[in-house]
């Protein structure tokens, strides 16, 4: 019975729960890696004593957080749980493929861990650029294991993407148009299309790297007529859509949270929100070389990528101001979920502004590979994606579990986390502006103060993570059951009770076609 339910599951709710648990666990691993990094950088001089090991930590931290924490939780966890409920579908379109998508992740994670256990580990950075990732600078199986890990995670995501696209397009009630689906459903749809179009390019790139390493091909080796810059183009053609994949489901969740706790029945500017997400998805594919301003592109190429990158700020601004407009005039309920959402809006905007700075190719030549870039993407990930995940978690936890969190503890948790992440990453802007480079385990004494403060912030965030574990434990032991949920008329996922029955919508949902 246990095996049938959890190993061979075809139920979107159970698979969503598996994704959430796996992502939470991987998040702990990724947090551990980040704390080792910050411990090393807490003061000048060496702690770990081996720069290869330091770079392995940095690489593993990135891979774990991206592929095994943010994506499984946002797309696999929230996506699986909420999309079928929100469109009135009995399950996902391909329930067994859904199960396979999940079970490809633990082996993938195992391969990534194995890569750091053999030889010297993969100290390449998450970009895995050759020639550093080639078989001279990284002899041994480490990088090969990392590549296989990425292949499995990629297959998992591609299958999941096919599943979500099919489900969202095909499994709505006949009377429901695409423009009647909630914004979270749209965000998952756009995310799935991005995954489907970008991951095969990554697969091609890392497969060529694999053959360069093992079969003497020279795709990325100038000695045989190859070009390492080709790898960078292939990688970033995936890598840039990937960062939008990481944030788009968060956009969808924030729209729901802001609308709900503003007491509104719908978000401000639904169509604008939808097309902003679609625009972001499209533009995400035509700006990749802004990660490569320092490789010596023509000035006109740099001008194009600078301009195109800045254009993304427009649909993003549409979303930010629509969230603020949704809040405007609302009957605001100061719940922990809304606090996460407001934190998201502010900090994501700050991260977006530093992104506009980096979009300027002339400035980026100077700032590339400094801590300014680290600060930028951690503002949009560690305070964008993660805040969205936390907001979504405290908002939908009663739906998933049937129990309510202790609101006071949840607010305290938010405050500690808010202080921790800002103390960690705000000083890194200063470090970058004064020229401290990324991916080094040591630094000149001049950078000591801000690094020490940054490392202190990371340990404050650690206490927040530990408090979160306590809060979840407290909810499950106190067993405060959900009595009623407001605004179910425009929040369909709550309609079946908390938690919903194992099978929902066993007969087709009724949709009033006169809805406008």
From Swiss-Prot:
Its cofactor is heme; Cu cation. One of its GO terms (cellular component) is respiratory chain complex IV. Fe(II)-heme a binds at residues 61, 378. Residues 41-50, 118-140, 213-227, 287-298, 358-370, 434-446 are mitochondrial intermembrane. Heme a3 binds at residue 376. Na(+) binds at residues 40, 45, 441. Keywords: Calcium, Copper, Electron transport, Heme, Iron, Magnesium, Membrane, Metal-binding, Mitochondrion, Mitochondrion inner membrane, Respiratory chain, Sodium, Translocase, Transmembrane, Transmembrane helix, Transport. This is Cytochrome c oxidase subunit 1. The lineage of its organism: Eukaryota, Metazoa, Chordata, Craniata, Vertebrata. Component of the cytochrome c oxidase (complex IV, CIV), a multisubunit enzyme composed of 14 subunits. The complex is composed of a catalytic core of 3 subunits MT-CO1, MT-CO2 and MT-CO3, encoded in the mitochondrial DNA, and 11 supernumerary subunits COX4I, COX5A, COX5B, COX6A, COX6B, COX6C, COX7A, COX7B, COX7C, COX8 and NDUFA4, which are encoded in the nuclear genome. It is a multi-pass membrane protein. One of its GO terms (molecular function) is cytochrome-c oxidase activity.
């Amino acid at each position: 019975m246990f095996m049938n339910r959890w190993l061979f599951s075809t139920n979107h709710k159970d698979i969503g729960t598996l994704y959430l648990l796996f992502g939470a666990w991987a998040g702990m691993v990724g947090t551990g890696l980040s704390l080792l990094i910050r411990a090393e950088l807490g003061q000048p001089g060496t702690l770990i004593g081996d720069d290869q090991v330091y770079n392995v930590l940095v690489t593993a931290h990135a891979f774990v957080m991206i592929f095994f924490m943010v994506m499984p939780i946002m797309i696999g966890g929230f996506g699986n749980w909420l999309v079928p409920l929100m469109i009135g579908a009995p399950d996902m379109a391909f329930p067994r493929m859904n199960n396979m998508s999940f079970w490809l992740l633990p082996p993938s994670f195992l391969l990534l861990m194995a890569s750091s256990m053999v030889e010297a580990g993969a100290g390449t950075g998450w970009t895995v650029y050759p020639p550093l990732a080639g078989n001279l600078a990284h002899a041994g199986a480490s990088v090969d294991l990392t590549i296989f890990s990425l292949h499995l995670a990629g297959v998992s995501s591609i299958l999941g993407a096919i599943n979500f696209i099919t489900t969202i397009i095909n499994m709505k009630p006949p009377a429901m148009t695409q423009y009647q689906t909630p914004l979270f459903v749209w965000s998952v749809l756009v995310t799935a299309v991005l995954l489907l179009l970008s991951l095969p390019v990554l697969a091609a790139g890392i497969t060529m790297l694999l053959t360069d390493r093992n079969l003497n091909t020279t795709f990325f080796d100038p000695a045989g007529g190859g070009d390492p810059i080709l790898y960078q183009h292939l990688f970033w053609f995936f890598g840039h859509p990937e960062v939008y994949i990481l944030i788009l489901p968060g956009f969808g969740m924030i729209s729901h949270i802001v609308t709900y706790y503003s007491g509104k029945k719908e978000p401000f500017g639904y169509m604008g929100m939808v097309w902003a997400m679609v625009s972001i998805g499209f533009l995400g594919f035509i700006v990749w070389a802004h990660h490569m301003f320092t490789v010596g592109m023509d000035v006109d190429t740099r001008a194009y990528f600078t301009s195109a990158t800045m254009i993304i700020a427009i649909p993003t601004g549409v979303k930010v101001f629509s969230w603020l407009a949704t809040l405007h005039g609302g009957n605001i309920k100061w719940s922990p979920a809304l606090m996460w959402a407001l934190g998201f809006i502010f900090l994501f905007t700050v991260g977006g502004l530093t992104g506009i700075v980096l979009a300027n190719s002339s400035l980026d030549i100077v700032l590339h590979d400094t801590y300014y870039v680290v600060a930028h993407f951690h503002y949009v990930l560690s305070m964008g994606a993660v805040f969205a995940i936390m907001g979504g978690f405290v908002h939908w936890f009663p739906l998933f579990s049937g129990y309510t969190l202790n609101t006071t503890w949840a607010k305290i948790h938010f405050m500690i986390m808010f202080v921790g992440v800002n103390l960690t990453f705000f000083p890194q802007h200063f470090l970058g502006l004064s020229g401290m480079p990324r991916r080094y385990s040591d630094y000149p004494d001049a950078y000591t103060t801000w690094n020490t403060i940054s490392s202190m912030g990371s340990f404050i965030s650690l206490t927040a993570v530990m408090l979160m574990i306590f809060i979840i434990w407290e909810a499950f032991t106190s067993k405060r059951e959900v009595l009623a949920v407001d605004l179910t008329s425009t929040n369909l996922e709550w309609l079946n009770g908390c938690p919903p029955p194992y099978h929902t919508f066993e007969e087709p949902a009724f949709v009033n076609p006169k809805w406008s």
